[in-house]
Amino acid sequence: MRGDENAAGPQRARSASGDELDALIHEGDAEVLLALLENPNMQEQHVSRLLERLDLSAELLQSVAKEGKWNSSESIRIRLARHPHTPRRVALSMLRKLFLFDLVRVSLLPSAPADIRRAAEELIVARVPHLPIGEKLTLARRGPARVAGAVLAGGHPQAVKLALANSFLTESQVLKILARAELPARVVVAISQHPKWSVQYNVRVALVRRPHTPVPALLEFLPDLALRDLQDVAGLEQLPEHSRKYVQQELARRASEIK
């Protein structure tokens, strides 16, 4: 009798409809859930609701991903990409098919696996140079730190302002931008004048090294630098001559105070 009952569950799942189908989406038996995918009454909304469950097996998630009528749906692709049990290969495949701002959604989801969030960011960053300015501005305002940083580094005036105000932007990302060999002057100037970033000690050290940091900012930052950092900056071969002059003046001032 138990065997008949066990067989009845998957069999019922293959043909259920209406309220019964809705109820089976919450079934705990893995075989029943796999059988549901064979049910012709399963629509996109049913599969989307099923994928909201965090206890689904990798086998079931892979079965959904293999089905053309499901993996062509953006809603289902998002859910597969962000699900913690989706095999990585499958999740990455789904990510590559997502629209730009769906990638942003995945990249910002704390519940999505960390490596999938990073992969989503990488895909967005790769698209940034080719995007229209309107989308760049939206990414500057709402994108995760790496994405906002990529837009910031592009140097568009409006994007620079928005990216520096982005709540996800981190000091680490600002420092990576300032470490780039090539960087538009307006980006350096904007960071040096920004009320949040220009007061960060490590950002000030990085700005002192840049050729486009305005002299007034340079003169403001130098007295706050630790002696060791000031000496390190003075020893940089690529330091601009005008900056070197002010650094040496600051070193001389401190030496005179010691005497």
Where are these regions (language model features)?
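Alpha-helical scaffold segments
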Residues: 1-259
